[in-house]
Amino acid sequence: MRLLGCFFLIFLTWGSARAQGEYCHGWLDSAGNYQAGFQCPEDFDTADANICCGSCALRYCCAAADARLEQGSCTNHRELEKSGVSAQPVYVPFLIVGSIFIAFIIVGSLVAVYCCTCLRPKQTSQQPMRFTLRSYPPETLPMILTSGNLRTPSRQSSTATSSTSTGGSVRRLSSSRADPGYLVSSPPPPYSSAHSIHLNPSSTFLVSNQYFPYPLQPEAIANKSCPDFRQS
């Protein structure tokens, strides 16, 4: 019984394979459109149309063995592989080239900065500058010396004033001594003291002649008392 069952299955399989016929693979037509493959015979074909006939660009099922198509010689029977990546736009290559150029500029700038930082010599600590006349050109030395002299006008003016006053007092003293009829003294201060002293005949008190309209004799001065300016 098992053998009969096996033979029956083999017969059904062979009969179904014989009834199906050839398989026409999918192809690309002349317009570039893909046509899906099919099994001969199709639904609208007769039962004996189990052979794939026609050309590489147009395929159909037929019963004539001499019209059979050698599908192995066709190159347009393969289905285009569907990729998950969509078609890239036109500007993508330009975007890639621009990105590479910008990256090259950035990398070059970083390398240049690194090289300049590492190869630049270290600066030594600057020592304080010393002022010397040798450091200035000869043309500027008169200006420096002149400016140095202009900084001390007060000392020179005070020295000149003191020398002038000293010279004037010396001249007045010498002119007073030249005249034997007058007694020369320095001018008294603008204040006077209430105390008075008697001058000794041996001591003399010199009074300038500018305070008297007439000449005085030494004897008249000896018997008079004058205010004491030393105690003030």
UniProtKB/Swiss-Prot annotation:
It comes from the Eukaryota. Residues 151-177 have a biased composition (Low complexity). One of its GO terms (cellular component) is endoplasmic reticulum membrane. Residues 115-232 are cytoplasmic. It is a single-pass type I membrane protein. Its main location: endoplasmic reticulum. InterPro entries: Shisa (IPR026910), Shisa_N (IPR053891). Residues 146-185 are annotated as: Disordered. Disulfide bonds: none annotated. It is found in: Endoplasmic reticulum membrane. The chain crosses the membrane at residues 94-114. Residues 1-19 form the signal peptide. Residues 20-93 are lumenal. Keywords: Developmental protein, Endoplasmic reticulum, Membrane, Signal, Transmembrane, Transmembrane helix. Pfam families: Shisa_N. Plays an essential role in the maturation of presomitic mesoderm cells by individual attenuation of both fgf and wnt signaling. Regulates head and somite developmen. Inhibits both wnt and fgf signaling through the regulation of protein maturation and cell surface transportation of their receptors within the endoplasmic reticulum. PANTHER family: PROTEIN SHISA-3 HOMOLOG, SHISA. Belongs to the shisa family. Interacts with fzd8 and fgfr1. 'Shisa' was named after a sculpture form, common to southern Japan, with a large head similar to the Egyptian sphinx. This is Protein shisa-3. It comes from Xenopus laevis (African clawed frog). The lineage of its organism: Eukaryota, Metazoa, Chordata, Craniata, Vertebrata. The gene is shisa3.
